[in-house]
A protein has these predicted regions:
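Positively charged n-region of N-terminal signal peptides that target proteins for export
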Residues: 1-5
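Short helix/loop capping segments that flank catalytic or ligand/cofactor-binding pockets
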Residues: 95, 133-136, 180-181, 413, ...
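Bacterial N-terminal signal peptides
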Residues: 6-17
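Conserved, mostly hydrophobic/aromatic
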Residues: 64, 129, 198, 308, ...
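Feature activates predominantly on carbohydrate-active enzymes
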Residues: 56-59, 63, 103-284, 427
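Catalytic domains of carbohydrate-active enzymes that cleave complex glycans
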Residues: 489-690
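Acidic, contiguous N-terminal accessory segments
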Residues: 21-116, 150-156
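Catalytic-core regions of glycoside hydrolase
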Residues: 72, 147-149, 173, 204-206, ...
Length: 690
C-alpha cells in the first residue's frame, strides 16, 4: 500500500450530487503550453463508487501530498477555488462536467479531460465503468509532473483511451533467493506494494502462485497463517486495486513434509520426500490430491480464478485426459463449496507441455523435472493434443473454464477450436527467463515477437508476462505493458522507452537513470565509470528528488532501482576494463588484478541476490559471468600473456595464474560460487581458446 494512502481525513471531498448549475458551465481547456496546478487541488469522488475507485482517489491524494508536502485540505466542491479533480462520472456531473456517451470505450477505457471554470480548472477522469475510472486514475498519476514542491499536469488534457488487450496480466515465478529480489521472501506488505506497482502500470490481472505444493496437510499453524496472508493479498488486489487475481497450483503435486523448515517462504522445493506427484488413477493418491485442494480452498477462497498447470510442476506419465478432467471436477466441487455465496470462480488450464506427455520417469520416483522436450517442441503432435484437450473440456467441464496458452503455436489450435475469448496468452520468458542469473534485461525483440504473434488472433482475451525478479526487470516489463495497453507503443525506440520509464521512477533524475539502464550493455568502461560516480552520489545522498508514479512504490526503499543499477554497472565496468586491457600489453599481475576485480563484483552481486544458493543446490551449475565475442578474444589474449614468450601456454601456467585469486575469493564467498560460477569455467575457456 502506498506510504500515506488510507488517511481519509485530509484526502478527499465526497461528491454529494451538487447541482450542475452551480458549477458555472465549464468550458474545455484550449490553451496549450500552460499548466494545471494540483498542489492545492480538491479531489472529489462519489461515495457510491466501488472500493477500488475510492482507493485510487486516496492514492492520487497521497501522491500529491508526497510531492507538495501539503495535506489535501477538505473544502466543499461548490465553493472551493483552485483546481478540482473529479473522479468518476457522478463526481464530474456534480461539478457541471458532462462527458457525453462513453459506450464506445472498451473494457478499462476512460476519458481524462480538463475544463476551465470560474474560480479554477476542473480535471475530470471517468471510464465507461468503474474499472475504466480506476485505470484512468492510474494514467493520471503517470501524467503528473513536479517542479520542486509544485505538482501539475500540462494543459490542456484531453485523453480518450481504450486498451488493445482487455486482460493484461503478470505472473511471478522464481526461486528462493534473498529479500527483496525473490518474491518467495516477500511478506504481506511487500506483496501489496507489488500489487500497487502492477496497478500503476495498468495491469489488471495478477496471477499468483502461493506454492500450496510445499504445504503438507493437515496444515501447521505457520502454514495456515501464510495462506491467510495470501487471502488478504488477494483481497487487497481485488477490492483496493480492482484487479482480478488468478491462483496457480499444480494439478497433482502435494506437500508430504515440511522438509524440516517451518517457514514456507524459505522451505526447499522441489525435493524428493518433501513433495510428491500423485497418480490420479490411484484412489488413495487421488484422495490426497483432494485433501490438499480442500485445505487450500478453505482459506484462499476469494480468487477470481484457479489455474492448474498441466505439468512442471506435476503431471503424470501417460495419464489420460480423463484423469486431468477428474482433477478439474474435484477442484470445481471443492472450490464451489468454499467460495463466497453468489460467486463461481473460473477454472483454467495452463497449457504447457500437455497432461500426461513428455515425462521420462515414473513421477513417484522424483519431483525433479525430466522431459523429452526440446527446441523442436511444441511440434504438430503437441498442438494436436492441445486441440484434443480443449474438445475434452468442452464436452466434460462445467462453465466457467478458461485457458492459458503457454506456447506460441497453441494459439492456432485455440483459434481453430473457437475459444480465443477464453484464452490468455502467456509467452513464458519474453520478459525474463527462469532460472536466469539476476540481471536487468534490455532489448525489445522478444516483446515485439509476443505482440506480433498475438496480433494474428483477433478476439484473444488477453496477454500476460512473467518475472523471476520483478525489481530488476522494469525496462522490459514497462515496455511489455505499455504495449499491451496500446500496441502502437511497440514502435517506440528503446532509449525513449527508458526515458519514459525513468520519468515514472525518478523524474528529477530521468536522463541519468535512462543512461544507466543503457550502460548495462555499454562497452566503454570509462563511460560506465562516469555514470557510476553519479549513481553513487545519488545513493549516498539518499535523495533522488520527488518520486514518480512508480518510484514512490519501490521497496524496500525508494532507491532500490538506483542501488541495483549501481551494483550491476560495477560488474559491467569491471568486465569491460578487463576486455579493454587485454587489447593492450598488460602485465600478468595487471591481468590477475582485473580478472579478480571482475569476479569480486560478480560474486558480491551473486551473494547480495542469493543466487549463491542456486549454485549450491546445483540448479545453476554453470558460469555467472557474461560470455561474448569480446570476452572470447580477451581470453585468447590472456592465454598469450600467460605464455610469457613461450610458444604455447601449458595448463600449469594457467592454473597457477588463478591460484592466488582463488584463495582471496574463497575467503569472502562460498566455494561453489567461486569455483563453479567463475574460476573453473573461466580457466577452461582460457585453456581451450585458440
Amino acid at each position: 500500500m502506498p506510504r500515506t494512502v488510507g488517511v481519509w481525513a485530509f484526502v478527499l471531498v465526497l461528491a454529494c450530487g451538487a447541482p450542475a448549475s452551480e458549477a458555472q458551465a465549464p468550458q474545455r481547456s484550449e490553451e496549450h503550453g500552460s499548466r494545471i496546478a494540483l498542489s492545492t487541488a480538491t479531489i472529489t469522488v462519489d461515495p457510491t463508487e466501488p472500493s477500488y475507485v475510492q482507493y485510487a482517489a486516496r492514492d492520487l491524494s497521497a501522491y500529491l501530498e508526497q510531492i507538495t508536502g501539503l495535506p489535501r485540505a477538505a473544502a466543499k466542491p461548490r465553493s472551493a477555488g483552485g483546481t478540482r479533480v473529479a473522479i468518476g462520472t457522478a463526481a464530474a456531473r456534480s461539478l457541471g462536467v458532462e462527458f457525453g456517451a462513453l459506450d464506445d470505450l472498451r473494457d478499462d477505457g476512460f476519458v481524462i479531460r480538463s475544463f476551465e471554470q470560474r474560480g479554477g480548472a476542473v480535471l475530470a477522469v471517468a471510464g465507461r465503468d468503474p474499472h475504466g475510472t480506476n485505470i484512468g486514475v492510474a494514467t493520471l498519476l503517470q501524467l503528473i509532473r513536479a517542479d520542486g514542491r509544485l505538482a501539475y499536469v500540462d494543459a490542456p488534457v484531453d485523453r480518450r483511451e481504450s486498451p488493445t488487450y482487455a486482460v493484461r496480466g503478470i505472473h511471478l515465478n522464481g526461486w528462493p533467493l534473498n529479500y527483496p529480489y525473490a518474491f518467495r521472501a516477500w511478506k504481506e506488505a511487500d506483496w501489496k506494494r507489488f500489487v500497487d506497482i502492477a496497478w500503476a502500470q495498468r495491469i489488471n490481472l495478477f496471477y499468483l502462485w502461493p506454492f500450496m505444493e510445499i504445504l503438507p496437510v493437515p496444515l501447521s499453524s505457520g502454514d495456515e497463517a501464510y495462506l491467510q496472508e495470501v487471502h488478504r493479498v488477494v483481497e487487497y488486489a481485488q477490492r483496493q486495486r480492482g484487479m482480478d487475481v488468478w491462483i496457480m497450483q499444480s494439478a497433482n503435486r502435494i506437500g508430504v513434509s515440511d522438509c524440516g523448515v517451518r517457514d514456507p517462504r524459505v522451505r526447499p522445493y522441489w525435493v524428493n520426500d518433501c513433495q510428491k506427484d500423485m497418480n490420479p488413477a490411484d484412489p488413495a493418491q487421488f484422495a490426497r490430491i483432494e485433501q490438499s485442494f480442500d485445505a487450500f480452498y478453505a482459506i484462499v477462497n476469494n480468487a477470481k480464478a484457479y489455474v492448474m498447470i498441466d505439468s512442471d510442476p506435476g503431471g503424470w506419465p501417460q495419464s489420460p485426459l480423463d484423469d486431468q478432467v477428474r482433477i478439474f471436477k474435484a477442484a470445481r466441487r471443492l472450490i464451489d463449496g468454499h467460495a463466497a455465496a453468489g460467486t463461481r470462480p473460473t477454472l483454467i488450464d495452463w497449457m504447457h507441455v500437455g497432461w500426461g506427455r513428455h515425462k521420462f520417469f515414473t513421477s513417484t520416483d522424483s519431483v525433479v523435472g525430466a522431459y523429452d522436450w526440446t527446441d523442436k517442441n511444441p511440434d504438430e503432435s503437441d498442438v494436436a493434443f492441445m486441440g484434443e484437450t480443449i474438445r475434452t473440456f468442452k464436452a466434460q467441464l462445467d462453465e466457467p473454464w478458461g485457458l492459458i496458452a503457454g506456447q506460441p503455436p497453441y494459439l492456432s489450435i485455440v483459434a481453430k477450436e473457437q475459444v480465443l475469448g477464453k484464452t490468455v496468452y502467456l509467452p513464458y520468458g519474453a520478459i525474463e527467463s527462469e532460472p536466469a542469473f539476476p540481471a536487468t534485461n534490455l532489448g525489445q525483440d522478444s516483446v515485439r515477437r509476443v505482440f506480433t504473434r498475438a496480433g494474428e488472433f483477433t478476439g484473444l482475451r488477453g496477454v500476460m508476462g512473467n518475472n523471476q525478479l520483478m525489481l530488476l526487470q522494469f525496462p522490459r516489463t514497462f515496455y511489455f505493458f505499455m504495449s499491451a495497453w496500446n500496441t502502437q507503443y511497440l514502435d517506440r525506440a528503446e532509449p525513449d522507452v527508458l526515458l519514459d520509464l525513468a520519468r515514472q521512477l525518478y523524474p528529477a533524475q530521468q536522463r541519468l537513470i535512462a543512461d544507466a539502464f543503457l550502460a548495462l550493455r555499454d562497452d566503454d568502461a570509462e563511460r560506465i565509470g562516469s555514470l557510476l560516480s553519479r549513481l553513487e552520489a545519488l545513493e549516498g545522498g539518499g535523495d533522488a528528488g520527488p518520486a514518480g508514479a512508480l518510484g514512490r512504490l519501490l521497496f524496500p526503499d525508494a532507491l532500490a532501482v538506483v542501488r541495483n543499477l549501481r551494483m550491476q554497472l560495477e560488474i559491467r565496468q569491471a568486465r569491460q576494463a578487463f576486455v579493454a586491457a587485454m587489447r593492450g600489453r598488460p602485465t600478468k599481475a595487471d591481468a590477475a588484478r582485473l580478472v579478480e576485480r571482475y569476479f569480486d563484483r560478480l560474486l558480491e552481486w551473486n551473494k547480495e541476490t542469493g543466487w549463491d544458493k542456486m549454485i549450491a543446490i546445483t540448479v545453476w551449475p554453470r558460469p555467472i559471468y557474461e560470455a561474448g565475442k569480446d570476452l572470447t578474444e580477451a581470453l585468447y589474449r590472456l592465454k598469450q600473456i600467460l605464455a610469457e614468450g613461450a610458444p604455447y601456454t601449458g595448463y600449469g601456467r594457467i592454473d597457477a595464474f588463478f591460484g592466488p585469486m582463488v584463495t582471496a575469493l574463497r575467503a569472502k564467498y562460498d566455494e561453489d560460487s567461486v569455483m563453479v560460477g567463475c574460476i573453473e569455467p573461466f580457466k577452461l575457456a582460457v585453456v581451450q581458446s585458440q
